[in-house]
């Protein structure tokens, strides 16, 4: 069944001799029973059709629960990173403190070794090696003995470390020469006393022969 085309309402000035009443009557007769008249040119007739339009697709906005979950996870990750950074900083500070303590103990040990008279290669703090002590003679006091340094014990890269070696060698030579004189004078009475038994024996022999 052909449906009559309802002319646009209010457009009668553009067209002449348009039988609007005939159009409306014909449209009323041809419409199905129980159906509702719809005019696409009139928004009032289309109010029901707009209400029956398919719903819009759901928006892509996240739910509040999801937002809270994401925020809590981010806060947890941030707090975890801060705690790890804090632990790393504490560990670095403790390691630095331990390293400083080790360096302090090492410097104390070095200073003790440098000042210790029993240390093999002890230094006087000026870069010069101390001369090594030698065995003292019984007839000499420790104050009068000049210790002979080991030959070549100075630092070849530091020429100033050999300063005073010539003076030490000359002094040692003088002390040894004076010590030889003292020891020679002390041996003289012993040599004379060793001759006394020969003299007495010769006298006895002469006396015995005279008799």
Swiss-Prot record:
In chain numbering, the residues marked as site (Cleavage) are 10-11, 152-153
Note the effect listed for residue 9 to A.
No cleavage at position 9-10 by AvrRpt2
User: Can you list the GO cellular component terms from the UniProt entry?
Assistant: cytosol; endomembrane system; extrinsic component of plasma membrane; membrane; plasma membrane
Q: List the disulfide bonds.
A: none
What about PTM? Phosphorylated following the interaction with the Pseudomonas syringae effectors AvrB or AvrRpm1. Phosphorylated at Thr-21, Ser-160 and Thr-166 by RIPK following interaction with the effectors AvrB or AvrRpm1.
Stretches with biased composition (Polar residues): 105-114, 178-201
Q: What else is known?
A: Cleavage after Gly-152 by AvrRpt2 is critical for the release of RIN4 from the membrane and its subsequent proteasome-dependent elimination.
- Name the UniProt record assigns to this protein: RPM1-interacting protein 4
Q: Which gene encodes it?
A: RIN4
């Amino acid at each position: 069944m052909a449906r009559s085309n309802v002319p646009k309402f209010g457009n009668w000035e553009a067209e002449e001799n348009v039988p609007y009443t005939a159009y409306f009557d014909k449209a009323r007769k041809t419409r199905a029973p129980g159906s509702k008249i719809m005019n696409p040119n009139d928004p009032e007739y289309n109010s029901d059709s707009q209400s029956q339009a398919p719903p819009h697709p759901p928006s892509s906005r996240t739910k509040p629960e999801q937002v809270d979950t994401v925020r809590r996870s981010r806060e947890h990750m941030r707090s975890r990173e801060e705690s790890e950074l804090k632990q790393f900083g504490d560990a670095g500070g403790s390691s630095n403190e331990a390293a400083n303590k080790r360096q302090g103990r090492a410097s104390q040990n070095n200073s003790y070794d440098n000042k210790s008279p029993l240390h093999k290669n002890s230094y006087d703090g000026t870069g010069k090696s101390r001369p090594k002590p030698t065995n003292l003679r019984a007839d000499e006091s420790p104050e009068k003995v000049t210790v002979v340094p080991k030959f070549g014990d100075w630092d070849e890269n530091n020429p100033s470390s050999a300063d005073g070696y010539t003076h030490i060698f000359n002094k040692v030579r003088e002390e040894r020469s004076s010590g030889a004189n003292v020891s020679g004078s002390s041996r003289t009475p012993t040599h004379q006393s060793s001759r006394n038994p020969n003299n007495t024996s010769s006298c006895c022999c002469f006396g015995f022969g005279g008799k």
